[in-house]
Every structure is written in structure tokens, then in C-alpha cells.
């Protein structure tokens, strides 16, 4: 099978992750991260041929300068690789209801991404910059740019899952509903779980937990998403690094009316100062929480709230499985590495038949997949995610 090299771009508000991946076998030829955009220390790091390199982008540099560097410096050193690029895949955080699957980028698609900016005000504008710069930098691939939406996998949710108990006109007229996030990751690990269990995806019932600085849980029934913990925005649901997740909406009125906080201050509090950071008052890093669980009250407090919330979501989603749950799957930076999070969470779910195997749980870290429960237990798995591969495969498939 001939190679299909795809440039995968993930443009954040202040960073750009990139990789060149062979969609036929998953081989990664180049990968890197440009970060600290709009700051004096803007820089780019990349791996090629097993070696790591780094360079300054110049004070105030952003997406345009980063893509110029990728094209004119990194790829210029690899002309054969550059010549073999067949497509460009773009990760898009929010596609609203318009996009139920990956699509080739057109003017209509660009407009659809713009229309979803209110639901992803930090991410979608950055994605649009990435698309515009890619079209400029690779004119030969102008019709080979593909948008892959984090929300697409969740578009199979039934109405009872995605509607809020608000006036229905807010959904009809303004699109206010649950959309979810991390869909590409939830889809990938569902596929991988089906392979491990030797089942067709359309017969698979799993609960997938993508746990990173942002986190979400998804109920997958017969291979399709039927509910997910993130909502209109990625603020709803689990305790996250700096995000509160679920809370009583009236807290917002109390913060405004009784404590004099502005809407912007409340937004900052809930999105950037809460979660693990808020509970520890030290850090958003789960490694601190895990390392200090036995000795520091702040770490224990944060870990206990985090795992309590996660276990509640897993437990509630078992009600959507039609009487059969094949596995719970952990993925993402925390899901793949924080053995303590997995153990404390599954210990709360003994009623459902989960019993952790300590040795297996400790072995399934740092990029290793595996079963983490005892043979007599209901199954729990660790599966490292690979969103970039899904994006590359979708881009290759749609541009073939």
C-alpha cells in the first residue's frame, strides 16, 4: 500500500500542534508544537528523524509565523517529505449541529465554523487562522484541506440527552443544547476497544473517559454516542484542571449579586481558576495531586472531589447501556497515566462489579495499554488516544 502523508494541524488560541502522519500505517514522520504566541518567548519545538530541535519564532509571533517556519525551515530540510503530502487535516473544536462528520474545507464550511464561534470563542477563531494560513502556504493542496470536528461523534445523541430543560425556543432559535467535546478521542478509543474485545463497533457498549487538562465521559451504545458530559461548551461535566465542571447555576447569581463580581470575572473564575487549581489553591497539575495525596490536605481534597464526580458520571451512564456494559475505557493524559485516579474511581463502583488489579493498573501507564481489572471483574481498559491519526485517516479518505 502506498503511503498517504497528511499534515495534521491543531491550532489553539496561543499554540499550534502539528504532525506529518502516514494515514496508512500511523507512522509519524515529523511532530511539533509552536507555543507562547503573542508573547516575547514565542517558540517552536519539533521532532524529526528521532532528534529534537527547538527555535525562537520572534517576539509576538503567532500562527502565521509558525506555519511559515514549518514550511520554510522544517519542511525545506525535507523536500521529499513535503512533496509527498497529499492532504491537510484540521482539528476543529466546535461544528455546532451543521457538521455530523469530517468534511473537505469549502467557503460554506468556513462559514459554518465562523457561525459556531459563540460556542468556542477561543478555539474556532484560531482554527480559521490555521485554515487560512494552510491555504496560503500549500496552494497545491487548496482542495485537500479537511475539517475534523470534535463535536461530530456526539451528533448521534438523542434529544433527551442533548436538550436542556430550558424554553425550547432557546434551542430552536439559538442552538442552545449539549454538543460535547473530545469526540475524536472518544471515537478512536471506542474503535480500539472493539478490536481488543473482538467485536464489531456497532455492537459495542462502552463508557469512555477522556481525562486530561479538560475531561469528559461519553456513553457509547452500539458504537454510537448516546450521551456525554460536556455541554454547550467544554465547561460542563467533570472536575478539570482549571474548569469547575458541574455546579448549581445560581452560584453565578450569588457571585454577581452578593459578591460584586462581574460577568467577565465569573467567567475567568469558572474556566481558569477552578477545578484542581481551585481545590488545591496551588496547581492544576494532577501529578501534584497524585504525588501528595497521602500527605497534603489540599491534594487529598482535590483528588477525592475529582474521583467522586468521575465515578458518578460512569455510574449514571450505565443506565444507558441497555443492560450490557462491555468495558470502561480510560484515555487522555490523566486517564493513561494517573493510576491512582483509576483505582479510586473504580473502587467507588464495586456495586457494578469492578475490582482493580493493582499490578495491572500500575503497568498500564506511560503509553502502554491494557486491562486494569481482575479476571473476575467487569472490564476496565487503558487505551492511549491518537486523535492525530483519526484526523489523518479522515483527511486521506475524503481526499482520495
Curated annotation (Swiss-Prot):
Pfam families: Acetate_kinase
Keyword ATP-binding: yes
PROSITE patterns attached to this UniProt entry: ACETATE_KINASE_1 (PS01075), ACETATE_KINASE_2 (PS01076)
An example molecular function term from Gene Ontology annotations: ATP binding
Catalytic activity, reaction form: acetate + ATP = acetyl phosphate + ADP
Record-marked site positions (Transition state stabilizer): 182, 243
Location in the cell: Cytoplasm
Keyword annotations of the record: ATP-binding, Cytoplasm, Kinase, Magnesium, Metal-binding, Nucleotide-binding, Transferase
Keyword Kinase: yes
Cofactor: Mg(2+); Mn(2+)
Active-site residues, Swiss-Prot/TrEMBL: 150 (proton donor/acceptor)
UniProt GO BP: acetate metabolic process; acetyl-CoA biosynthetic process
Predominant subcellular localization, coarse grouping: cytoplasm
Gene Ontology CC, one term: cytosol
InterPro entries for the chain: Ac/propionate_kinase (IPR004372), Aliphatic_acid_kin_short-chain (IPR000890), Aliphatic_acid_kinase_CS (IPR023865), ATPase_NBD (IPR043129)
Binding residues for ATP: 17, 210-214, 285-287, 333-337
Binding site for substrate: 91
Cofactor binding mode and count: Mg(2+). Can also accept Mn(2+).
Function recorded in the entry: Catalyzes the formation of acetyl phosphate from acetate and ATP. Can also catalyze the reverse reaction.
Name the record gives this protein: Acetate kinase
Organism: Yersinia pseudotuberculosis serotype O:3 (strain YPIII)
Gene behind this protein: ackA
